[in-house]
Amino acid sequence: MIFTILVCFFAGMGAGIGTGFAGMSAAAVISPMLITFLGMDPYMAVGIALSSDVLASAVSAYTYGKNKNLDVKNGLIMMVSVLAFTVVGSYVSSLVPSTTMGNFSVFMTFLLGIKFIVKPVMTTKEAMEKVSPKKRAVQSLICGVMIGFICGFIGAGGGMMMLLILTSVLGYELKTAVGTSVFIMTFTAFTGAVSHFAIGGMPNIAVWILCIVFTLLWARIAAVFANKATPKTLNRTTGVILVVLGIVVMAFSILN
């Protein structure tokens, strides 16, 4: 039991810090750890990870929103298209072998981390506001469709995809990008978790609750810190966290 608690603690810690700082999906960290150390069925592990994502993302989104780092309007547009296509992607993924799914998102986490360290996102809120609302709405819709399908297919909350697209394609400032990403992820992860449990049955309750609690705790700590940090510090910290988590999770995949 102590071993299980420790696995859940570190899985929750990695996932929570990743969520609070970078809007990363808990699925990227929790799933591989539960599969590697507790020998859990991959589909169930993703279900637990997604449900851990829900509260962690919600508390992070609340923290970012309170600090005015959240674009609700375009977030909602993107969310609707993400949700619709997550279902499509999820169905397609149930027809594909499970190993191909996780590795892609982990590798992407690692590359994105390097990007933040080498080429930080230094966009300001003023620059963001120059884009016309109509153009931004259309961009949000199209990007949402792409993200949704890929999320559903890979079984990750798509935090990394959203962060990449919000900062690179839509030109968001980093804090607003993370805030908007965790806001959307609250809903995508909820939908994903419900559909996973509906298809795969209920998970191991102890592991499920432990992962949710630890992820929530660390996400709150990370989000509070991230909102106080300067853009430069935040870029570097986010980059380092993503690179470290990417390497750790890739190591688990190799162990497996």
For the regions a protein language model found, what residue spans apply to each?
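Juxtamembrane transmembrane-helix boundary motif
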Residues: M1-I17, S31-F37, P42, T63-F149, ...
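Transmembrane helix-bundle signature of multi-pass membrane transporters/permeases
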Residues: G16, V46-V54, V178-A189, L242
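Membrane-embedded alpha-helical segments of transport systems
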Residues: S51-V59, A84-V88, V92, F183-T191
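Short, structured loop/turn "capping" segments at alpha-beta junctions
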Residues: T124-K125, A156-M161, Y172-T176
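Transmembrane helix boundary and interhelical junction motifs in multipass membrane proteins
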Residues: F21-I30, G155-I165
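Membrane-interface alpha-helices at helix entry/exit sites of multi-pass transporters
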Residues: M40-I48, K73-N74, G171-V182
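Hydrophobic, membrane-facing alpha-helical anchors
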Residues: M1-T4, C8, S51-Y62, G157-T167, ...
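A small-residue-rich subset of transmembrane alpha-helices
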Residues: S52, T180-F197, A206-A219
